[in-house]
């Protein structure tokens, strides 16, 4: 279903009773774990490896979400699989499509233990040569970064490897990115190749506070016999959980991004409070030692541009000094407004001056084009619906944003 640009689509709600049944999912299991699960339902040990390969292909190459579609699996085994496991997608509570083609899905996952169902947001950003999916790793966030909307939502829980991967699987479903899939009429997607070519762990939450589940999900996403994403097209963004940075490069091997945002400890303590635990000196040293870092595999430093806070040319000079010797590029992010914030975006002319100074010092300094602002899908704007403002306030704000879209950019 295609919606008018910038308006919310109430997607047909699928109850997904299979997902809500409490049955364990095969999605997100390693090959070893999947083999153990199959053995537990009676698959003969000599067949386990072959059956795992079959299921892996159906789940991650063909993209099926129903055991009945696994046509080369014997019916008796399919019935056993259906009785014991689920491979269902999460519910789509809402799908929104921005004026610029950005899509945002509000997804609902079932309770874990005694908890309640939870909601998270996932964003798809299409461009001519690539399609980037921004994936969440937690429900809410514990970091309370003062400029970030997600940081105003308390941490509810970590997402499982299944729930992290399901965001990618659902997006590929909706965009027709699996074999035999069809792209929605009028959808803005890359003209060639995969619709989802890149993923960034930049959604809700701090990925390195959920290291094991994120690691499992990303290793499955980059497995050459399945989803087969290149590790050079997967970026994990952290606010600076220093002890896990080396492990990220060593055990996962994806590209690294650092949510920097300030070049002085006193300011970063305020903007990104984790800096009080892991100050800039420790953070930059961890970046210097990141496995595989080189001019071909640079670390991205994200820097949100806040008017009269961190956008002076003196800040730019200190930034260049701070990163001296680190293979890096600096993404400058115009601040994306959200209801209740006290911050303002830097003037565009000041952002360009800042970028020019960094560029002349030898660092690539692209200014990130704001995407999805009108549906609160831009950087720093994500927050699950159940924790957002009252509905009337939200609708009024979104109407204002839609009316002003274009003037902002």
Curated annotation (Swiss-Prot):
Binds 1 [4Fe-4S] cluster. The cluster is coordinated with 3 cysteines and an exchangeable S-adenosyl-L-methionine. Keywords: 4Fe-4S, Cytoplasm, Disulfide bond, Iron, Iron-sulfur, Metal-binding, Methyltransferase, rRNA processing, S-adenosyl-L-methionine, Transferase, tRNA processing. S-adenosyl-L-methionine binds at residues 205-206, 237, 259-261, 336. One of its GO terms (biological process) is rRNA base methylation. GO terms for cellular component: cytoplasm. It is found in: Cytoplasm. The active site is at residues 121, 379. Disulfide bonds join 134-379. Its cofactor is [4Fe-4S] cluster. Residues 127-376 form the Radical SAM core domain. One of its GO terms (molecular function) is 4 iron, 4 sulfur cluster binding. Its EC number is 2.1.1.192. It catalyses: adenosine(2503) in 23S rRNA + 2 reduced [2Fe-2S]-[ferredoxin] + 2 S-adenosyl-L-methionine = 2-methyladenosine(2503) in 23S rRNA + 5'-deoxyadenosine + L-methionine + 2 oxidized [2Fe-2S]-[ferredoxin] + S-adenosyl-L-homocysteine; adenosine(37) in tRNA + 2 reduced [2Fe-2S]-[ferredoxin] + 2 S-adenosyl-L-methionine = 2-methyladenosine(37) in tRNA + 5'-deoxyadenosine + L-methionine + 2 oxidized [2Fe-2S]-[ferredoxin] + S-adenosyl-L-homocysteine. [4Fe-4S] cluster binds at residues 141, 145, 148. NCBIfam families: rRNA_mod_RlmN. Specifically methylates position 2 of adenine 2503 in 23S rRNA and position 2 of adenine 37 in tRNAs. m2A2503 modification seems to play a crucial role in the proofreading step occurring at the peptidyl transferase center and thus would serve to optimize ribosomal fidelity. Belongs to the radical SAM superfamily. RlmN family. HAMAP family: RNA_methyltr_RlmN. This is Dual-specificity RNA methyltransferase RlmN. The lineage of its organism: Bacteria, Pseudomonadati, Pseudomonadota, Alphaproteobacteria, Hyphomicrobiales. The gene is rlmN.
């Amino acid at each position: 279903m295609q919606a008018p640009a910038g308006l919310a689509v109430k997607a047909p709600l699928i109850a997904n009773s299979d997902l809500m049944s409490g049955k364990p999912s095969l999605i997100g299991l390693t090959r070893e774990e999947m083999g153990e699960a199959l053995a537990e339902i009676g698959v003969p040990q000599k067949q386990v490896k072959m059956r795992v390969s079959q299921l892996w292909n159906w789940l991650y190459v063909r993209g099926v979400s129903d055991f009945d579609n696994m046509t080369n699996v014997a019916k008796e085994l399919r019935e056993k699989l259906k009785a014991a496991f689920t491979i269902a997608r999460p519910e789509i509570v809402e799908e929104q499509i921005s004026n610029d083609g950005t899509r945002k899905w509000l997804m609902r996952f079932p309770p874990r233990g005694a908890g309640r169902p939870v909601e998270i947001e996932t964003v798809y950003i299409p461009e001519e040569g690539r399609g980037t999916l921004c994936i969440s790793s937690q429900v809410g966030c514990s970091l309370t970064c003062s400029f970030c909307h997600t940081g105003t939502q308390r941490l509810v829980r970590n997402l499982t490897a299944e729930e992290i991967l399901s965001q990618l699987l659902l997006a590929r479903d909706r965009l027709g990115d699996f074999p035999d899939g069809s792209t929605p009429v009028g959808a803005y997607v890359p003209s060639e190749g995969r619709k989802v070519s890149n993923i960034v762990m930049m959604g809700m939450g701090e990925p390195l506070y959920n290291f094991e589940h994120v690691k499992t999900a990303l290793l499955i996403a980059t497995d050459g016999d399945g989803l087969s994403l290149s590790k050079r097209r997967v970026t994990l963004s952290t606010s600076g959980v220093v002890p896990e940075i080396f492990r990220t490069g060593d055990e996962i091997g994806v590209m690294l991004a650092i949510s920097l945002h300030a070049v002085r400890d006193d300011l970063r303590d305020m903007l990104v409070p984790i800096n009080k635990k892991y100050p800039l000196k420790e953070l930059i040293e961890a970046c210097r030692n990141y496995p595989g870092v080189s001019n071909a595999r640079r670390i991205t430093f994200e820097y949100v541009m806040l008017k009269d806070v961190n956008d002076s040319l003196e800040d730019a000079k200190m930034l260049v000094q701070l990163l001296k010797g680190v293979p890096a590029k600096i993404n400058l992010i115009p601040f994306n407004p959200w209801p209740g914030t006290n911050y303002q975006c830097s003037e565009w002319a000041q952002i360009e001056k800042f970028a020019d100074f960094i560029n002349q010092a030898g660092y690539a300094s692209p200014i990130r084009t704001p995407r999805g602002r009108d549906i609160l899908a831009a950087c720093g704007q994500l927050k699950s619906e159940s924790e957002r403002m009252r509905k009337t306030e939200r609708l009024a704000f979104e109407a204002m944003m839609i009316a002003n879209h274009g003037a902002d950019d």
